[in-house]
Amino acid sequence: MVTSEGLASVDSWLYRQGFNVDSWLLSDTFSHDNDLLARALHTTVTAPHTLTPSSAFFDSSAVSHPSSTNTLSSTVSGASDPEIIGGGAKRKRNCLLTDGKAAKRRARASKKSQTTFITADPSNFRQMVQQVTGAKYIDDSSSFGIFDPIVKPEPLRFVNKLPCGPSDRSTAVPMLDTSAFLSNHHQENLAVGNAFSGNSSSVGLPSGKPSATADPGGSAVEFDNYPTFPTLESWKVM
């Protein structure tokens, strides 16, 4: 059983010999370190003074310069000296570019549909419509300007398509009002019957009911009560 009796009588030099350390080295080492620390504190508190040859190395290493401090801090952060210098130069260039000239943005294509506006007064609105729809251009300084005069189209009549002449308008159908002709059909039949009454071979048209007339050969032909229809122009003549 291990006891602690008799440990007080053991000399301390036995432990020092067990670690292979001399007693005179320990005292000198600590005294030298204490001296260096005292001088370093004295140089940081007081003004700089003339360095002695014995403490020149310690003072030069103890006093830190701003450039070396920056270098050490940057090295600890993980970047080398050339990279730090290059990065600072790039930042300065970027600052100068942004301050001197603003970066241009590319123009985006507008998504709005292009709308064409046409200005026209109420006075020349019809001429504007003809121009937009493709009216013919004429070089004339008339009241209509550069456009053809606005003309109402001629109505297409059925009488113009019939093979009859312009004087005989009784074979055409009336265009607008048929009731006027139906009310005066008796006078029309009388006029047509008088025109053909001189010819014996022609057939006379009665004024009332339909009838048949016999020719010398004995043949009979029955005619309708309304054989022809006049046009509007024939009413003026009547």
UniProtKB/Swiss-Prot annotation:
TM stretches of this protein: none
Motif (VQ): 125-134
Disulfide links within the chain: none
GO BP terms, alphabetized: cellular response to hypoxia; regulation of salicylic acid metabolic process; response to salt stress; response to water deprivation
Tissue: Expressed in leaves, flowers and siliques.
Reported induction: By cold, salt stress and dehydration.
Subcellular location field: Nucleus
GO cellular component: nucleus
Key word Acetylation present: no
InterPro entries, A to Z: VQ, VQ_15/22
Region (Disordered): 68-87, 201-220
Keywords annotated in UniProt: Calmodulin-binding, Nucleus, Stress response
Keyword rRNA-binding: no
Positions occupied by motif Bipartite nuclear localization signal: 92-108
Bias (Polar residues) ranges: 68-78
General function of this protein: Calmodulin-binding protein that functions as a negative regulator of osmotic stress tolerance.
PANTHER family: CALMODULIN-BINDING PROTEIN 25, VQ MOTIF-CONTAINING PROTEIN
Protein's name in the database: Calmodulin-binding protein 25
Underlying gene: CAMBP25
